[in-house]
């Protein structure tokens, strides 16, 4: 005989969506529970804030009014001897100073400020997103590419001439390199009779001086011989060596040079006399 077929019960079949549904319901219950707890906490905070505001308003009232019950306060008529307004103001000012000393800020005002700031941020966010979308739509690049030759042809067919001067090179001899003229082949000799420049100055006392001859070679003062510079005018001066002083002919010097030598002689005599 052939084996008997197994009969499957519909109740024994497992639905694959059942565990997902159970997990979704558990998550939904947890989320609802957390939302309910937050709402309860907010209600408790609002009740505490209302109680604190009620107490602060009650403290500002005068003592005579605080001792009354609600029935007396509601049926209150103007008394024959009214409370002095100045005393009421003084008590209210003292209470306000005491409250300010504690630096207590009601939570309702802070929460209202936060909620208003959040609402403003939420209102500004969609505006910014729409502005960005508009800008992006305006700056959308065009897919059509134009050849380079067309862009060049649109700039204009006329050729603009540049106003720059051509470069001056040694090969281009027809142009002068300066206003004065071409550079001479031989450098001219230095003329001491040229006008003095603003930077020209006389040597200071005990200052190191490096002189130069008329031929253009520098003169070093490395020897042991004493050198005396005598000015003769027109920016020129003569160097006299102490070793060859006997061979100097003073008649060849002008009056200014002789006057300078006599002045130097007098100064040296006074210097040597004071040293003794």
From Swiss-Prot:
One of its GO terms (biological process) is heart development. Coiled coil: none annotated. The keyword Magnesium does not apply. Gene3D superfamilies: 6.10.140.560, 6.10.250.1900. Residues 111-158 are annotated as: Disordered. It comes from the Eukaryota. Keywords: Cell cycle, Cell division, Centromere, Chromosome, Cytoplasm, Cytoskeleton, Mitosis, Nucleus. Belongs to the borealin family. PANTHER family: AUSTRALIN, ISOFORM A-RELATED (PTHR16040), BOREALIN (PTHR16040:SF8). Component of the chromosomal passenger complex (CPC), a complex that acts as a key regulator of mitosis. The CPC complex has essential functions at the centromere in ensuring correct chromosome alignment and segregation and is required for chromatin-induced microtubule stabilization and spindle assembly. Component of the CPC complex. This is Borealin. It comes from Danio rerio. The gene is cdca8.
